[in-house]
Curated annotation (Swiss-Prot):
Enzyme class: transferase
Protein's UniProt name: RNA cytosine-C(5)-methyltransferase NSUN2
Reactions accelerated catalytically: cytidine(48) in tRNA + S-adenosyl-L-methionine = 5-methylcytidine(48) in tRNA + S-adenosyl-L-homocysteine + H(+); cytidine(49) in tRNA + S-adenosyl-L-methionine = 5-methylcytidine(49) in tRNA + S-adenosyl-L-homocysteine + H(+); cytidine(50) in tRNA + S-adenosyl-L-methionine = 5-methylcytidine(50) in tRNA + S-adenosyl-L-homocysteine + H(+); cytidine(34) in tRNA precursor + S-adenosyl-L-methionine = 5-methylcytidine(34) in tRNA precursor + S-adenosyl-L-homocysteine + H(+)
Active site: C323 (nucleophile)
Taxon lineage: Eukaryota, Metazoa, Chordata, Craniata, Vertebrata
Biased composition (Basic residues): 1-13
GO biological process: regulation of mRNA export from nucleus; regulation of stem cell differentiation; tRNA methylation; tRNA stabilization
Amino acid sequence: MGRRNRRNRQRHQRSTEQRSPAEEEQRRKAREQAAWECGYPEIIKENKLFEHYYQELKIVPDGEWDKFMASLREPLPATIRITGYKSHAKEILHCLKEKYFKELQDIEVDGQKIEAPQPLSWYPEELAWHTNLSRKIIRKSPELEKFHQFLVNETESGNISRQEAVSMIPPVLLKVQPHHKILDMCAAPGSKTAQIIEMLHADMNVPFPEGFVIANDVDNKRCYLLVHQAKRLNSPCIMVVNHDASSIPRLLVENNGSREVLYYDRILCDVPCSGDGTLRKNIDVWKKWTTLNSLQLHGLQIRIATRGVEQLAEGGRMVYSTCSLNPVEDEAVIASLLDKSEGSLELADVASEIPGLKWMPGITQWKVMTKEGHWYEKWEDIPTSRHTQIRPTMFPPKDEEKLKSMNLNRCMRILPHHQNTGGFFVAVLIKKAPMPWNKRQPKLQRRPPVSACDASIAVAPELVKAVTENSAGMADEPAVDTENGETKPCTNQSDSSKTDIVCCPPPSKKMKLFGFKEDPFVFVSEDDPIFDPIQTFYALDPSFPKKNLLTRTQEGKKRQLYMVSKELRNVLLHNSEKMKVINTGIKVLCRNNDGEQYGCAYRLAQEGIYTLYPFINARIVTVSIEDIKVLLTQENPFLSKFSKETQKQANNFDMGSIVLKYEPDPQEPETLQCPIVLCGWRGKTSIRSFVPKNERLHYLRMMGVEVFKEKAEVLEKKPVEGKACDEEHIDEKMDIDGAKEESKELSGNESGDDEDPKEEDVIDRGVLEHVALKNTSAIPASVEDQAEDASVSKESVD
């Protein structure tokens, strides 16, 4: 067999060498054509069972069925949302309106004139827009290449999110305030989580809101998509965890020296669903849809929602949502919750909270259909053989008075043809009292105060002894005396570990129960010797919360320092055995060996500069708008290229990390009217910025700099043989370095012995020297990455 294969390869090689380049090209085209003709068949957008089912349930108003089905067969329009809490939101909105949207009006794609994008009437402050273009058209059409580049870069820098319109509804109905403690139970890939973070940071002048978001997902791999989404917003108030939402552990926090159960003010319960509301973008659903999907998910949806209301604080609000139109997944779940809550829950009337949104009220009567098409109107009609498949909670309550008191008409069902969206269901629940099975709330457990030094280590779950969790999620609660409701103190701890379990050093062997490999989250003690040089070098304010800094290594040099809010620190310290934490904290300082000789081994990180800047009182250089352009378009500009005032300020500082601050001038409204804070490095004769490529492009756009270059020009630009094009090499190296850095942070694998590379290696290599200023034709435009859209918008599909 081996000799035969070798002979075949040799014959193929000889025949290839004998063919001319023209013949080779002809054969290649023939192969491509054959592959195209043998491709996947086009999916027919029809499903008779689907139509029969929903026509029978009458969820669509009379006379609208044809419009409903026609809209389902049309591609879903693209929708974008501007990050509202960032100071640059107004500038981005202005840029979109005055530049990109106006240019779109004069373009035709495949003979179809593009309609001007319109704001979503129900989303506040015109921060969400939709167009009649699908995402596929935007991605593939050469005429829209410039607009696509803008979306990709701004999405990566966290200033824009591409998210389905109906997916934006649940966070709006949560009514998040900066002091709220929020749980997102099924968060990945994270577009709704990002929206919640925006609301949490409504006041940009407050670097640490009192509230926080714990974002959970059962899929470990999807958790990293969630981390990627959250990292774009650079918040110290987000924690990503990996648990089954139906048994997510109940957490403890310290309050005035006592330990108490953490109850959330807001919970988003966007459960896994059959997804038949997503037919417009997930066309596979057309051929795969059956009622069996809903019947199988119903029990899981009830368990997740039940666990959610258990952890909701009294007076708190939980939003339940699905991207399914099926009442078995929608009204049936809500009715089941209301029934067993015995008055502890009530459906909120939120019609006035989201004006401009068209929706249909929830239904009060429905039937259940099997995948074979058999209908059942009540549980008593179900054959015994189907009792494991069809449950009593899938039917509406039989008691008319009870059914009326539930107010199921307050549920909201969004139909695709009403506002050119996907299908969606949402309901808002208010918790008025403890759940009947949780009437006896545990009392506070007193314990001695813990010093900052002692309580300095919060390790990841694989480094501590496993705590067995009950499958229903109740075994993780504090031990409660059933007679008096008091929590039982832990008695199996040694005297040296009674103060707090997270004070104990981790065991030598890692726990293998959960199968993930996250590095520990180690809080740095306030008397750590690394703080004095940092405090002196940057003249940090005395109010700087040193105890909120953590690192991801137990031993060796601390390579990167991350910061979390005080409230998240509290959660981490008291729940390290219960939580499978994937990621938390924002990077604020990075180790740089060359910095030691200049007085501080840590440089500032651009990712966390807006969090750290309010505490910095030294090494700040105020720059002009022209200085910012120089910093972002040149790799390592000499001091002589900056304004005289900037040169004067820079000469007052020794070499090392600095802050570059631009303050807008209200007297010049035509210039950029939002502040910019950049991390930089003061060299011997130069200043360079530590800004990722996408952020550079963002700032340049806001300043009116053209950063677009067509793909064709990039592809036609071939390097000289044996020598790569300098510009392409720089972009490629920057992308590789950035990918390595992000991969390390997402995986949490950080070696304490590794140190930052030298200054010239850690700085982003996106030189952008070829960027052209607006109305300046002498300078060629910058080469921008043409990568496909890497962002993942969760449009409520699991």
